[in-house]
């Protein structure tokens, strides 16, 4: 695992240059996703562990990977000879990440994280807990200049999810969201969860394996809505659809300027468990912040008649596929020895 050791050494050099004593790398993305695009697989790149759940924390001398029991065997194999210790979550003898860091560092030391990769709530909790030991949490991306051959963000165009499948128009969905915003006394709603955005704007994509989502952000206010997405992902058809539904389109990174430009007298609604700290820091301190579960999360949980019918059709197809598998298995097991990989 020479390559992993070299990456750890490069990161530790960056830590020293930045005056940082520890760095935390989760296995998520700026949208609080568990299943993520290759571009954001930072934890996998630094450790070699490619399970869907896990976090790496390292100091200038030690490193550990925290993951749950699903991955104890896999992580043990993939971390071999990397100098990264496997920290088995759920066992009484395993300290949590912040407790481990607090023990390894001293008062006055700094811990760094990429604020894009942590939700507002998780960042605040870490900051508060570390402060009890006199340790400061700082926002800095130390991997951007180290991971030089990083994959590009997905560029495949997204597509419109037709109302015959969605069962509700974008106009009606925005009306429902604005009604919920009014109840929460919010002028602006900032969205970052990809499933929420796909549902609200009736769009789908192939940006994340096995998840039909589009990498984007969104802002909804009392009179307008804006989708922040890479221009190359838009087609004439999708742009026309969004414009017909009074949805503005801007570049993916333009979300930061949009957040900074929100007037100081406005109230901004964010889901603290989903919205990342980097975006949150872009909002003026003078703006009022409302923290609540995303209204979209609740709205999309209640299925309309079209969606329920779609589920029924999907279950029929799923049942046919499972029946075919059972038939195949019943015939094969009589003739040969089968394994999980057969």
Identify what each model region corresponds to.
Residues 1-342:
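Terminal domain-start leader segments
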């Amino acid at each position: 695992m020479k390559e992993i050791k070299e990456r750890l050494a490069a990161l530790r050099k960056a830590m020293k240059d930045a005056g940082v004593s520890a760095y935390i790398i989760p296995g998520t993305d700026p949208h609080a996703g568990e299943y993520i695009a290759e571009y954001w697989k930072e934890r996998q790149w630094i450790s070699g562990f490619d399970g869907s759940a896990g976090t790496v924390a390292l100091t200038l001398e030690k490193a550990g990977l925290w993951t749950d029991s699903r991955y104890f065997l896999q992580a043990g194999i993939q971390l071999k000879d990397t100098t990264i210790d496997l920290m088995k979550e759920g066992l009484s003898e395993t300290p949590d990440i912040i407790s481990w860091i607090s023990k390894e560092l001293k008062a006055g030391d700094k811990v760094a994280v990429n604020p894009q990769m942590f939700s507002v709530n998780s960042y605040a909790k870490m900051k508060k807990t570390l402060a009890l030991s006199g340790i400061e949490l700082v926002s800095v991306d130390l991997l951007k200049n180290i991971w030089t051959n990083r994959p590009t963000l997905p560029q495949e165009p997204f597509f419109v999810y037709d109302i015959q499948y969605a069962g509700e128009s974008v106009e009606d969905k925005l009306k429902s969201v604005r009604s919920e915003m009014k109840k929460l006394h919010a002028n602006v709603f900032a969205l970052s969860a990809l499933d929420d955005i796909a549902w609200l704007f009736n769009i789908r994509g192939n940006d994340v394996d096995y998840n039909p989502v589009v990498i984007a952000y969104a802002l909804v206010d009392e009179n307008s809505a804006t989708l922040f997405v890479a221009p190359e992902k838009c087609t004439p058809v999708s742009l026309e659809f969004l414009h017909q539904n009074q949805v503005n389109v801007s570049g993916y990174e333009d979300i930061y300027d949009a957040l900074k430009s929100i007037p100081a007298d406005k109230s901004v609604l964010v889901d603290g468990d989903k919205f990342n700290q980097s975006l949150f820091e872009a909002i003026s301190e003078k703006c009022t912040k409302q923290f609540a579960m995303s209204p979209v999360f609740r709205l999309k949980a209640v299925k309309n008649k079209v969606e329920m019918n779609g589920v029924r059709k999907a279950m029929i197809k799923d049942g046919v596929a499972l029946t075919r598998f059972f038939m195949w298995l019943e015939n094969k097991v009589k003739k040969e020895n089968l394994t999980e990989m057969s």
